[in-house]
């Protein structure tokens, strides 16, 4: 957070149906600058390069600072982000992109080898604080703490490449078995940093 006024709003549009808006506000809450805040946010959506793939992100980051004197500083920090659609996580094979297919053609640049119902979403939360107090020119105490939680949900089927040798039975079987991932994952972390 800053004690000087900050007021910023942004709008952005671009190719692939990109639409984005964001804001960043910060200021002191009192005349002495003892209390200050900052609020930053973002909303974004776009189509990914591959067909049927989208990106969506919503984030907000509130922060609050308490400075009772010039030797003490306590800042509360937080960040919340939701990505209902994170875009395309597949890959395109060498056959059909770098090298032509046996029929001489190449895959389109928006080719999606996955299933139409592929999804990958992510939700992140972080809260913490930063504290320091200067006793004198020699001794200062600092502590930073952060708790983070990350949840992901995935449902996807994807290919391993193009079967370039149809006479090979193993290749036929290998190309027919597309791997699938489905799951929900949760990670929680605590980070503490002390300095004296």
Residues covered by each model-derived region:
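Outer-membrane beta-barrel translocator/receptor signature
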Residues: 1-62, 66-72, 125
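Acidic/polar loop-and-plug regions of large Gram-negative outer-membrane beta-barrel proteins
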Residues: 44-48, 61-67, 71-134, 138-140, ...
């Amino acid at each position: 957070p800053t004690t000087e006024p900050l007021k910023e709003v942004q709008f952005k549009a671009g190719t692939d149906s990109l639409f984005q808006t964001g804001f960043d506000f910060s200021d002191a809450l009192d005349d002495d600058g003892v209390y200050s805040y900052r609020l930053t946010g973002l909303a974004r959506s776009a189509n990914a390069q591959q067909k049927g793939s989208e990106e969506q992100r919503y984030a907000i980051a509130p922060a609050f600072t308490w400075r009772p004197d010039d030797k003490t500083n306590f800042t509360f920090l937080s960040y919340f982000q939701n990505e209902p659609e994170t875009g395309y996580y597949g890959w395109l094979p060498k056959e059909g992109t770098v090298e032509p297919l046996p029929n001489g053609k190449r895959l389109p640049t928006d080719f999606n080898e996955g299933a139409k119902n592929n999804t990958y979403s992510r939700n992140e939360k972080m809260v913490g604080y930063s504290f320091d107090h200067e006793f004198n020119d020699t001794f200062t105490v600092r502590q930073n703490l952060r708790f983070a939680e990350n949840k992901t949900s995935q449902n996807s089927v994807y290919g391993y490449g193009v079967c370039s040798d149809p006479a090979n039975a193993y290749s036929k079987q290998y190309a027919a078995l597309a791997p699938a991932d489905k799951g929900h994952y949760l990670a929680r972390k605590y980070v503490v940093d002390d300095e004296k």
